[in-house]
Amino acid sequence: MKALALLVLGALGLVLLAAGAGLPLYGDPTAPASLHVADDYVRGSMVDAHTPNVVTTMIADYRGFDTLGETMVVFSAGLACMLLLRMPERGRIPTLGRPKGNVITDIVTRAMIPVIQLFALYVVFHGHYSPGGGFQGGALIATTVLLARMVLGFERSQALFPTALGTPLGLAGVAIYAGVGFVALLFGGNALDYSYLPLGLPKDMLRNWGILFVEIGVAFGVMGTLVSIFDDLLTGGR
């Protein structure tokens, strides 16, 4: 079985190397990234989506399908960990330890968590105008839960974020992202064409709000998946 797995991985590696040979060279003026399309995206960020952060417009609007796929990949990784680690009762390995009580670390942690969470919300909601977005904000919120797990202990930190919410929250994030695209489809546009969202706003502002909606979905997906993976590793799949 091990030999077969190595054979499959080796074959996959050869396929990837062969595909990589067809990629354009760095700095190639004839490469797609160096042609007029990139300039159009940069110039159109404010005009099309009323968003000064070009990176956010690129990720969540112009190539929204790709980012939806990335969000689904993150959630799929969480599902894979769940399937691998959440074994039947007999096969479980007890990996969960009890942290030693420490008043100083407890107080500092409780003081830091709301500050980090507030900054994470800023990162999500201000991603149109400064570096940030759903991936970064979701990861920051997840770190507060992970910090609580490590300092306060698994049982005590359940009040902050129950383990049972991890996978459903990740699924909800993917559903929000895909749902925004489906709503646009229902109202006569292409999937993820936010200018067709039924909000009664100018087209550029519709795309601006659409970007925010999908970024919130990404934040939910990333947060739920990261916490779910960490909890599975921490508890041995309990």
How should each PLM-predicted stretch be described?
Residues 1-12, 162-174:
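Alpha-helical transmembrane segments and their helix-start/interface "positive-inside/aromatic belt" motifs
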Residues 4-35, 124:
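N-terminal signal-anchor transmembrane alpha helix
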Residues 21-44, 186-195:
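Interfacial/capping segments of alpha-helical transmembrane domains
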Residues 42, 46-59, 193-210:
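Short, membrane-exposed interhelical loops at transmembrane-helix boundaries
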Residues 53-82, 208, 212:
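Individual transmembrane alpha-helix segments
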Residues 68-69, 128-141:
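Short, non-helical or kinked segments that cap or interrupt transmembrane helices
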Residues 74-83, 143-149, 213-228:
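Hydrophobic cores of alpha-helical transmembrane segments in multi-pass inner/ER membrane proteins
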Residues 95-112:
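Membrane-water interface at loop-to-transmembrane-helix junctions
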